[in-house]
Design a protein with these regions (language model features):
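Beta-sheet repeat architectures centered on beta-propellers
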Residues: 14, 19-22, 41-221
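Carboxylate/His-rich catalytic cores and anion/metal-binding grooves
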Residues: 1-47
């Protein structure tokens, strides 16, 4: 069948390549393989052609994180720029990533802990790099958050931070930080002028600092 041909019963021959089955979760296409969730939802397999056996193979790529996938896989997505990464959300709200470079035999999984539970993940093209967007339920409030794709471009101590749901505020001699309604009643970590300060509880959408600062980041722990 050519690329511009029409599919008919007489010109298509579909052969069974695997008896494992798959979940109704969008498969991911990489440069050399297809990634799919096996029926049952607790394993991710490659679907790739093996020239040695002249047949399709479906090896498991999640052997080392089976304990994290017991609740099942809810969604997955892929970024390719600057590095190829597979993103996975589980039914119990975990966010996992996998540095995936099949040609170099690299399959490296990591967990990204955060307060609340992650419900979904999606990726989009960005100007500097592919963007990762997630839906997070934090204490009964759902919000859409984006991973900072330019985080590793900022290595200055004063502007670097490793925080979730963060709000950055700049000014001269700041003592009252507002706009923290999404952190109401929660313990907020404070990173000001390159130093970690004592945590505070968000009240009426704001926190008060003991000492003035020029750059402040607050985050839900």
């Amino acid at each position: 069948l050519s690329a511009d041909g029409t599919i008919t019963p007489s010109n298509v021959n579909v052969n069974l390549q695997s008896a494992l089955g798959s979940e109704p979760i969008q498969v991911l296409r990489t440069e050399s393989a297809i990634l799919l969730v096996e029926r049952g939802g607790t394993k991710i397999r490659e679907f790739v052609f093996d020239f040695a056996t002249q047949s399709y193979q479906s090896p498991v790529v999640t052997q080392l994180i089976e304990h994290l996938l017991r609740s099942g896989i809810r969604a997955m997505a892929r970024t390719a720029n600057p590095e190829q990464t597979i993103w996975v959300v589980t039914n119990d709200g975990l966010l996992l990533s996998c540095s995936y470079r099949r040609e170099e035999e690299v399959i490296a999984w990591a967990q990204h802990p955060t307060s609340g539970t992650v419900e979904s993940v999606s990726t989009n093209y960005g100007a500097a790099a592919d963007e990762v967007w997630i839906v997070v339920d934090r204490y009964g409030t759902r919000r859409v958050e984006r991973l900072d794709v330019e985080h590793w471009e900022r290595i200055e101590v004063d502007t670097s931070y490793h925080l979730d749901a963060a709000k950055v505020t700049t000014g001269d001699g700041l003592t009252v930080i507002t706009g923290l309604d999404h952190l109401e009643g929660q313990l907020v970590a404070v990173h000001a002028d390159g130093a970690d300060l004592a945590s505070r509880v968000g009240v009426a959408g704001q926190i008060t600092l003991t000492d003035p600062a020029d750059l402040v980041v607050g985050v839900l722990l």
